[in-house]
Regions:
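Extreme N-terminal starter segment of soluble prokaryotic enzymes
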Residues: 4-6
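Conserved GNAT acetyl-CoA-binding A-motif
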Residues: 101-113
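Conserved catalytic-core motifs of GNAT/GCN5-like acyltransferases
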Residues: 112, 122, 127
Length: 127
């Protein structure tokens, strides 16, 4: 029996699991500080989404609106736990963030990524 993945807004109770995923996935240069993540949950929870497999947090995407470009959301951090990659969770999270952006009146999602991830994001509609 397959367990459905649920997508929801990040809460402060998710913070430790988010940090653990970051540390398991990202290099020290890419890791966002605990304080930034906590502040993001408090201030921009609408665009900070988490994926859960039952009670376990398995991935997240953090989007932040830009004051210079109020119709943009910039993806600041995005990670899927290594044990859950290749199952479409990243695509599901990105699609969910796109839906939140449309519902919020945003026109663009923006991100920067290493060259080796370009094809992944292109596959998910980024150009």
């Amino acid at each position: 029996m397959e367990i459905p993945i649920t997508i929801g807004r990040a809460t402060l109770s998710d913070l430790e699991e988010i940090v653990a995923i970051e540390e398991s996935c990202l290099s020290s240069e890419e890791i966002v500080s605990y304080e930034f993540l906590e502040e993001s949950i408090r201030k921009i929870a609408d665009t900070f989404l988490v994926a859960r497999d039952e009670n376990q947090l398995v991935g997240y995407v953090l989007g932040e609106s830009q004051s210079l470009h109020p119709t943009w959301i910039e993806i600041r951090s995005f990670a899927i736990h290594p044990d859950h990659r290749g199952q479409g969770l990243g695509t599901l999270l990105l699609a969910s963030l796109k839906q939140v952006a449309v519902e919020g009146g945003y026109e663009y999602l923006r991100l920067t990524c290493p060259d080796d991830l370009l094809s992944y994001f292109e596959m998910n509609g980024f150009v």
